[in-house]
From Swiss-Prot:
Residues 246-271 are annotated as: Disordered. This is Mediator of RNA polymerase II transcription subunit 17. One of its GO terms (cellular component) is mediator complex. Component of the Mediator complex. Keywords: Nucleus, Transcription, Transcription regulation. Pfam families: Med17.
Length: 653
């Protein structure tokens, strides 16, 4: 070979045996790298002597500095600082002069000394801590932003959720011109319905027809209505009812929407439901107030027209008093329904006292109302609102439809009568009909075999009742009857009816078995089952009803007597049977509405020869008393047995 090859050999590391396992395998310690060796060597260096010397030097310097500081001049530090500043300023001035002289200025390169390991670790720790703090601040910012966004979404959800629920029942409009910021969404609730009004009616628009919807800080829908700005209609009888509403609750709905919102979601949901219900109730009150104002405005215009059923006796702001028939006076007023209506309420009460002068305490008012025949004021307050609703709202709807078949719409049929006049006539009729009903109930309650039925007339100025009586069945077999119709059936009635009809303040009675006047004057009986109709007044009504019932009983007994062939005749309220020639016995009815035991009593009277043979009038007349229909029928059968024809007929049965 031309050249020599040099081979360098390192010493083989001596590996000391660490352990020998049971199977003979040898385990050696792991190799240590260069850095670890250097670190272990550095750790072996003892710097304790250097630290001790350094500590001694520091202690000496501290002692010396403490001595010098006591003896130093107080301005020495400031002088040193000024000297250093002067040196630095001199260097800067020299550098500026050199640059201005265009001399070459060279900056010698400097190398940064290699940092120590502890400095690197310190810088890394500071950088990591700074970044960690920045991440924490960023996380907190994101959390706050997410929480604020969630609260905003919840507020929007609450607002629009409540608005959607209200939109189911109310007309919600959006005014885009008003939506200038997030707190005001520009929504309004329209409570008017101008499309249904008659253009010629002339209703004044209400200030409460449009209500602005706000968005409060809690995210809930808020409507602001001024206090004492809405009213409710009050109706009553002067001298019998107070002007205030006795059914009015002490708690009023707040016109603002400030509520404390609970924190939990369940309570929040419950409070939202309650809040929407309260808002709905408030809108209902405002809507009712608009309706009441329009109704009162219509009544004021109707009051200046001539009416048959009323006379205006007092007219003030939000108050009207009128006199109607049957000696009754009523008032209609607008009563404040806000949160503090005490002042206006006292003013209205004072006005009522001054206008009527007949205000009395309400104790025992229900009994007195019933006694005088006055109906429930709440029902007629509803009726007044109902006829106005039909006139104002129903009239516009019916223009495109056929006319309604309801008989209650009396105002369309009577073009000469206004709504107020029709209402007063209806109320007068109800007072009068209640008094008629009191008399009918008094008669029916005293006579056990009478019954009273009330018929609906579907007319506010017409009332109808029926007094009916069911008689016992006949004991005469059908085949042995002498009064039969062509089809073979007996003409016997089992029920008798008396119909009483009241129209306005006129009473008409229609009944069976009423003999006409001509037949009575001729002393002859008329058709037993003829139906006659006549009129009477309230004072004579009980007597007329009792006479009619007694006449029907006599008709029934007469028909039963003729069935067996007995000679019998009828003279108004008496039934006469001929015992023998020249002798007659009569069953006479006597009516007395004031008799609490039965109102109808019966007498047995002997006539002609019997009367002449007996001494004293008392022997020819005998009081039978108040008899039931079964007992009357038995008395009739006993009288028939006394008669020759009737006795023979009964023996052949």
């Amino acid at each position: 070979m031309d050249s020599d090859m040099e081979i360098s050999l390192d010493r083989l590391p001596i590996k000391r045996l660490e352990s020998i396992e049971e199977n003979g395998a040898e385990r050696f310690p792991s190799d240590v790298d260069y850095d670890d060796k250097r670190v272990s060597l550095i750790r072996r260096i003892d710097f304790a002597w250097a630290l001790e010397e350094e500590d001694e030097l520091k202690k000496k310097k501290q002692k010396k500095s403490s001595k010098d500081s006591v003896e130093q001049w107080k301005w020495k530090g400031m002088v040193e600082n000024l000297q250093l500043a002067h040196q630095e300023l001199t260097v800067i001035i020299d550098l500026i002069d050199t640059v201005q002289a265009n001399d070459a200025v060279t900056v010698a390169g400097m190398t940064r000394p290699k940092p120590m390991p502890n400095e690197i670790l310190s810088d890394l720790a500071v950088s990591t801590a700074t970044k960690l703090q920045g991440y924490r601040n960023l996380g907190n910012y994101f959390k706050q932003s997410a929480k604020a966004l969630e609260q905003k979404i919840n507020r929007e959800a609450r607002f629009y959720g409540a608005l959607i629920r209200l939109q189911r029942n109310w007309k919600v409009k959006r005014q885009r011109m008003l939506a200038s910021n997030a707190s005001n969404e520009g929504f309004t609730i329209d409570l008017s319905d101008s499309s249904l009004y008659d253009p010629t009616s002339g209703f004044r628009p209400s200030t409460l027809s449009t209500i602005r919807v706000d968005h409060d800080s809690a995210g809930m829908l808020a409507i602001n209505v001024p206090q004492d700005s809405w009213y409710s209609l009050r109706f009553g009888y002067v001298g019998l009812n107070p002007i205030g509403n006795s059914n009015e609750s002490d708690e009023h709905i707040d016109s603002t929407t400030g509520h404390d919102i609970p924190g939990t979601s369940e309570k929040l949901s419950a409070s939202d439901d309650k809040y929407v219900k309260e808002t709905h109730s408030l809108l209902r009150e405002v809507h009712k107030s608009i309706f009441a104002e329009q109704l009162f405005d219509m009544l004021n215009r109707e009051a200046f027209n001539e009416g048959v059923g009323f006379n205006i006796s007092g007219l003030r702001e939000n108050f009207m008093e009128m006199s109607i028939g049957q000696g009754a006076s009523l008032f209609v007023s607008l009563h404040p329904s806000g949160k503090n209506p005490s002042i206006k309420k006292s003013e209205s009460a004072t006005l009522l006292i001054e206008s009527s002068g007949r205000v009395e305490p309400a104790e025992g008012g229900d009994y007195r109302l019933k006694k005088l025949g006055f109906p429930n004021r709440t029902s007629y307050e509803i009726y007044l609102q109902q006829i106005f609703h039909e006139h104002a709202f129903g009239k516009a709807k019916d223009q495109l439809k056929s006319k309604s078949i309801r008989a209650s719409n009396q105002t369309e049929k009577d073009s000469n009568s206004g709504l107020l006049d029709h209402f007063c006539l209806s109320l007068t009729h109800r007072i009068f009909s209640n008094r008629v009903l009191v008399h009918l109930e008094s008669v029916v309650c005293k006579v056990p075999y009478l019954h009273l039925i009330s018929h609906p007339t579907w007319n506010s100025r017409t009332s109808s009742w029926t007094v009916f009586m069911t008689v016992p069945p006949s004991i005469i077999p059908q085949g042995r009857s002498e009064t039969q119709s062509p089809d073979g059936k007996r003409n016997l009635k089992t029920q008798f009816r008396t119909k009483v009809v009241v129209k306005d303040d006129c009473i008409s009675v229609e009944a069976e078995c009423t003999p006409n006047v001509v037949g009575l004057l001729k002393s002859s009986s008329c058709n037993l089952f003829s139906i006659n109709k006549y009129e009477c007044d309230v004072a004579d009504l009980p007597v007329m009803i009792l006479q009619q019932v007694a006449s029907q009983i006599v008709c029934w007994l007469l028909e039963e007597a003729r069935t067996v062939g007995t000679k019998a005749s009828r003279e108004f309220l008496s039934l006469s049977l001929e015992i023998v020639e020249g002798e007659r016995v009569s069953l006479v009815a006597h009516v007395n509405p004031e008799d609490a035991k039965g109102c109808i009593s019966w007498w047995l009277v002997m006539e002609n020869g019997c009367t002449e043979e007996r001494e004293g009038v008392s022997e020819s007349r005998k009081l039978l008393g108040h008899l039931s229909l079964d007992v009357l029928y038995s008395v009739l059968m006993d009288l028939i047995n006394l008669c020759g024809t009737g006795r023979n007929a009964l023996e052949r049965l």
